[in-house]
Amino acid sequence: MLRGIEIRGKVDKNVKSILTEECLTFLGELERRFGGIRKNLLQKRLDRQIDINNGILPSFLKDSDCKRATDKNWKCSSVPLEIQDRRVEITGPTDRKMVINALNSGAKVFMADFEDANCPNWENSIHGQQNMIDANNRTISFTSAEGRKYELNKQVAVLFVRPRGWHLNEDHLAIDGLSMSGSLFDFGCYIFHNHQILKNRNSNPYFYLPKMESHLEARLWNDVFVFSQNYLGMPIGTIKATVLIETILASFEMDEILYELRDHSAGLNCGRWDYIFSFIKKFQSYPDKMLPDRAKVTMTSPFMDSYVKLLIYTCHKRGVHAMGGMAAQIPIKNNEQANNAAMEKVRLDKQREVRAGHDGTWVAHPALIPIAMEQFNTHMKSQNQISYIPSSTAPNFEEIAKSLLSVDPVKPGDITEDGFRSNIVVGILYLEAWLNGNGCVPIHNLMEDAATAEISRSQIWQWIKHKAPLPDGKSFVTLQYYNRIFKEESDKLEKAHPNSKTLTDAIQIFNNLIVSPNFIDFLTPSCYKFVVDSERKTFSPKL
């Protein structure tokens, strides 16, 4: 093995085909050049959280070292023709059958997800990379246990890839004794193996970038792009990336984020569910910023509506796509009335997005594509509506800052026992699926990823901390209230799924997240440790 590079996962023919000596050398370069900067930025996140807990609220940057809204002259570089029209995009994990179905779905773009819709066990990570290579080579196929064969159509969606966020490690690969960045691993493997394939097809590498909290984190991605393009002999600007604005802090730095990535930008996306989670997390210490039941927080909530409007204005001012958020509904079988109601919600949501000025939107299931497509085809006659700027004058940023942070105080009835129980059940069920290797899970007729579990557990933690009012107006959410309902719901789940170790582990992880005196930033690292420890019991690492 190369000096200082250690594979800590099982080494088989699949691993060897991805982690070649040349690829490992490239990954080592990425980690050694950028890993330290990443860790410094993660420390800045912790420092920022302390400031917020101490009363220093987020605001727009007054003295940023990159041009902001006050400079109207710059625009991001143009994107290739094949991604000018992104009116409907489908997202999903990187397993072989899902990749084929998504590429064949009729959507304009498929975002293959190594992040929230993926459990990054070693097999998923390696097989996912191979599936990307085969997809770009147009050779990917799959035969089910029943003998059904899946192959690509002649016309397929454009492929985007979402690597893991900056906060996640790849524990199966160590550089100089330390786990590599999950972001750099996912990105590095993909760009190394696919850049030439894409060039040969007159296409480009496209990415979605998650979970950023500042323009400095966008600057790091840009530096990674520039280095990688130089290393691999690609012209600067070949890589294009859409940033998910899914943290409250990033919403105050959208202009700066676009500026940092201006040669590589393919716009911004409203990552609505993680945005809600981020709002709860960042304002964990603020009783006046608690949110009601998860189901009651919608895109028409004033703080969410302000975020959407600012994103569209900022993107179009800078000449890039403003992408709408996820519709997580899935078809409801054997209940036509419920299914029709669910599909009508999707229709209205997509109509709202396109009328607001979005250039495209996300769906989680192929059945939603015609519904979303109809709304965008009806209300957006051109490839996009980037030329539409919602206001002819610059917005009042002082007022926007207030609206981004403003929520109505929680009152009796906003938090219900049904909503409380739902958070517990959904959180545990998602964690159990994740521990079993599935990051994208159908629960209660919605396709859920990690964001839903994050909202569920963070709401409960915050409600307990601030003794949120219950519907009777006399009692409040307490640890004792949680313990009672948690025991009832976990007992039901264990009775329905006896002798399930992963369910027992999921219940333990969920409870640990709730009873921790300090808010735990992300739930996936806790789960990841279980996964890695379980894997290491079955093999001896190859050094």
UniProtKB/Swiss-Prot annotation:
Pfam families found in the cross-reference section: MS_C, MS_N, MS_TIM-barrel
Transferase as UniProt keyword: yes
EC number: 2.3.3.9
GO BP, sorted A to Z: glyoxylate cycle; tricarboxylic acid cycle
InterPro entries linked: Malate_synth_C_sf, Malate_synth_sf, Malate_synthA, Malate_synthase_CS, Malate_synthase_TIM, MS_C, MS_N, MS_N_TIM-barrel_dom
Superkingdom of this protein's organism: Eukaryota
Pathway: Carbohydrate metabolism; glyoxylate cycle; (S)-malate from isocitrate: step 2/2
This protein's record includes keyword ATP-binding: no
Catalytic activity: glyoxylate + acetyl-CoA + H2O = (S)-malate + CoA + H(+)
Keywords: Glyoxylate bypass, Transferase, Tricarboxylic acid cycle
GO MF, one example: malate synthase activity
Gene3D superfamilies: Malate synthase, domain 3, Malate synthase, domain III
Gene Ontology CC annotation, any one: peroxisomal matrix
Active site as annotated: 162 (proton acceptor), 449 (proton donor)
Family: Belongs to the malate synthase family.
Name of the featured protein: Malate synthase
Source organism of this protein record: Dictyostelium discoideum (Social amoeba)
Lineage: Eukaryota, Amoebozoa, Evosea, Eumycetozoa, Dictyostelia
Gene that encodes the chain: masA
